[in-house]
């Protein structure tokens, strides 16, 4: 293993000089050519929202949300962040809502057989075929991260990269099942979902974001539909990742989790099972359980480095992360290409240093 390097990124020259104009531009970009489609799949109707237009020789950015929310609740904060406007300009963005989770969805009748996460993964080919997307960069959170990982195992040739936030690739064990049954006697479905979405510290502190999402979930007319997606997530199968084995993700992957988040241990374990030459691990301090909501600036910066490592947006300037936050970089083995959050040599003449793990 190579020695650790310390990286400091200044915030002296912000990426966009006028924050107000940048925010206005980002909002306009999100509104221009936004289209909604309802796509029939073998496992129900999937609603997708398209922002922008397909770019030649560039993958589409496709998102899949977590339980207890739709794509707006999960990704609006990130994609409306001022610095994300540059990404929106360079890629078409497609947000997938799981069946029955979108705003205004029909409420399923009692006894409705909701698709499993494996089946939801098989709705993605229908979406890509309908929209004529030959390849994608997937961004998934929680259940959505699992769905993208499962999809990629079967359709690796269509996936150029993955950003997996709060992924738990393991099936629930007997202890988890027993604990869930016990908490089910005293906790409402909204409280159980909050425990999945946010850290214990955020919940005990009753932060603004927790209050907002608790009210949104509790008061939603779709709460019974949310529970179906929740049940499918808790019935997920083990993805059986194995480092050096046949079951692994072969594309560039960025794993993201908040420090002290409910899924921190699961993401750390997932990182230990994936190919270190293809995987980067970003642990975010002060971000809680939903880093794409609480730290959109960090997420934007990390994602831009990620797509730069894949050969896109090479001219984009990275200046958002503060000097007060240092990134400790380590590498296991040589990489075939520069990877996310990498730093070029001080002289500017050397190649970017690869990264396996970052804490910021």
Swiss-Prot record:
Organism for this UniProt entry: Xenopus laevis
Lineage: superkingdom: Eukaryota
One GO cellular component term: cytoplasm
Protein's name according to its UniProt entry: Protein NDRG2
Pfam family for this entry, one: Ndr
UniProt subcellular location: Cytoplasm
Keyword Membrane: no
Biological role stated in the UniProt entry: Contributes to the regulation of the Wnt signaling pathway. Down-regulates CTNNB1-mediated transcriptional activation of target genes. May be involved in neuron differentiation.
Main localization (coarse): cytoplasm
InterPro entries: AB_hydrolase_fold (IPR029058), NDRG (IPR004142)
Region (Disordered): 324-360
Listed GO biological process terms: cell differentiation; nervous system development; signal transduction; Wnt signaling pathway
Cysteines paired by S-S bonds: none
Keywords assigned by UniProt, alphabetized: Cytoplasm, Developmental protein, Differentiation, Neurogenesis, Wnt signaling pathway
Keyword Flavoprotein: no
Family: Belongs to the NDRG family.
Matches recorded under PANTHER family: N-MYC DOWNSTREAM REGULATED
SUPFAM superfamilies in the cross-refs: alpha/beta-Hydrolases
